[in-house]
């Protein structure tokens, strides 16, 4: 599940043409965010929310993309 969250996060970030640095915005290290996107490490919920906010993505939007991704795998 962690790997899937990171993968979806990366898809959203790239679709917005944002760099890791822009999304991290000092709330989290770029390296840590990169590891999260690759499914290597997790991040705190606070960091996750901050990064979503930096991309102007609501939690509901992320959940929508996540559920569509999961449903398409079935």
Predicted regions and their residues:
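DNA major-groove recognition helix of helix-turn-helix/homeodomain DNA-binding modules
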Residues: 45-62
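Short alpha-helical DNA-recognition segment
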Residues: 16-35
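Alpha-helical residues within helix-turn-helix
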Residues: 11, 21-22, 50
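Residues that mark the N-terminal boundary/hinge immediately upstream of a DNA-recognition element
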Residues: 8, 19, 44-47
